[in-house]
Regions:
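Non-catalytic C-terminal accessory modules of carbohydrate-active enzymes
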Residues: 203-207
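Hydrophobic-face positions in mid-chain alpha helices that act as interaction patches
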Residues: 18-121, 167, 177, 182, ...
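Conserved catalytic neighborhood of penicillin-recognizing serine enzymes
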Residues: 149-176, 180
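Secretory-pathway/luminal and periplasmic proteins that interact with or process carbohydrate-rich
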Residues: 9-10, 27-34, 152-156
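Short, low-complexity, Pro/Ser/Thr/Gly-rich segments in the mature regions of secreted, periplasmic
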Residues: 224-242
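Long mid-to-C-terminal scaffolding/interaction modules that assemble large complexes
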Residues: 131, 208-210
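A cross-kingdom marker of C-terminal helix-rich interaction/assembly modules
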Residues: 142, 147-149, 222, 229
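Extended, hydrophobic/aromatic-rich amphipathic alpha-helical segments that build helical scaffolds
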Residues: 1-24, 56, 115-144, 167-176
Length: 242
């Protein structure tokens, strides 16, 4: 049901997305992970077998290495822009990454955890977004506050003044809650495919790469190995990158 909710949300079939999310949320087998009482430490992770909101894990973390304990270097660090989205009272701020800005949501060793999950909080986020587009943005904010109650120490409740404000707050909460879980690319496609700019440094030289608004490059190419196995498949048309 959660995958179906995600799929229909991506297709902008909002009533179906809501209905499938309802089925997940109404299943009393799962509960949102309460970070107030979780007792997580620097040696434990949000994605763990005792997390009551996780329904299914997949994709071994060996494919998703964040960093190795034998090294002081991380594959990537949490950006200042992401960090700025979290208030000081937000318990996710000390749960989703460590003091060195290394992602800390799941284990970085290939023997301890899976790297991807289906979990209850996504159902709330999917339903909240669908509710905004169904004209029920006040109910969407209620769903967001249900998540925030389990994540934030004080003053967890937010409000919205209109539909647009509610949608922005739903998307912001989605970015907070699902960071590092491979949702962002699909979310950006659904949010109008905005322009992206990234500066990369290599050997002292800096180069800025720009993904224009609405670019065909928002669709990733079909891997060469797949195309070689099935000659009928035609690759995605993408502009040349400079």
């Amino acid at each position: 049901y959660l995958f179906a909710s995600r799929l229909h949300l991506y297709k902008k079939e909002y009533q179906s997305a809501k209905n499938y999310a309802d089925s997940v949320i109404n299943n009393e087998r799962y509960q949102l992970y309460d970070l107030h009482t979780a007792g997580l430490t620097s040696y434990s992770y949000f994605i763990n077998k005792n997390n009551p909101e996780i329904m299914f894990c997949y994709g071994m973390v060996s494919f998703d290495f964040i960093y190795n304990y034998s090294s002081t270097y991380a594959t990537y660090l949490v950006s200042d822009k992401i960090i700025s989205l979290f208030s000081n009272d937000d318990l996710r701020k000390t749960t989703f990454w460590d003091k060195n800005k290394k992602p800390h949501k799941f284990s970085s060793t290939n023997s301890q955890s899976y790297g991807n999950t289906y979990r209850l909080s996504e159902a709330y986020l999917n339903r909240a977004e669908a509710l905004v587009f169904l004209g029920k943005w006040e109910s969407a904010i209620t769903d967001i506050n249900t998540i925030r109650e389990k994540r934030i120490k004080n003053d967890y409740e937010i409000t919205a003044t209109n539909r647009e404000d509610a949608l922005n707050k739903v998307w912001e909460e989605r970015r907070r809650e699902l960071c590092f879980e491979k949702h962002r690319w699909f979310d950006l496609r659904r949010q109008g495919m905005p322009e992206l700019r990234h500066i990369f440094t290599n050997g002292g030289s800096r180069k800025e790469y720009i993904l224009p608004t609405g670019s065909k490059s928002y669709t990733l190419p079909i891997p060469k190995k797949i195309r070689e196995q099935n000659k009928i498949i035609v690759n995605i048309e993408r502009p040349e990158q400079q």
